[in-house]
Amino acid sequence: MGIVGKNGSGKSTLLKAIAGIFSPDEGEIDLHGHSISLLSIGVGFQNKLSGRENIFLSGMLLGFERPQIEEKLDEIIEFSELGDFIDRPVKTYSSGMYSKLAFSITAILETEIMLIDEVLSVGDAKFKKKSYEKMRSLIMNKDRTVVIVSHSSDTLRKLCDNILWLHDGEVKMQGTTEEVLPLYEEFMS
């Protein structure tokens, strides 16, 4: 599912509520005990720790045990394309490097629910293509729920079957990508 809306409409707030970072003002969110990960630029890393140390920290915060993380460590590092930077503090990373590492952890340490907040457009063209392909394979797994917030209609058309349109903190429309995106694009133009 994709989520669209102008800046300030509540997209990231909704993802953070689903992830349990804070509670909704009304109603409740029941994830039925499923594991969940939130991929958002600037969320979750300890800047003084190396990329490698942050892989372990992030994995443990997602509910994985150290042996499970160690089993996937090389795959995460390889996918991130960070090379020797993996052992440097993440405070030395560019925003693109930071996002590559965050995406790699989330994509390789597969949780049952993945929340992706505006990060699929970060990185060079090669990494974007690789990220799209990985996301597509994760989405094809029917045992996983993927929710993507993006301002890119092209991204949403490629990856999402359904769209939730938020406006001023309220659901303006929900339906198939083909139904909702044209109306949203017209509204925004």
PLM-predicted stretches and their roles:
Residues D25-I36, V171:
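ABC nucleotide-binding domain "signature motif"
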Residues D168-G169, Y184:
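Conserved ABC ATPase "signature" C-loop
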Residues V4-K6:
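The feature captures the beta-strand-to-loop junction immediately N-terminal to the Walker
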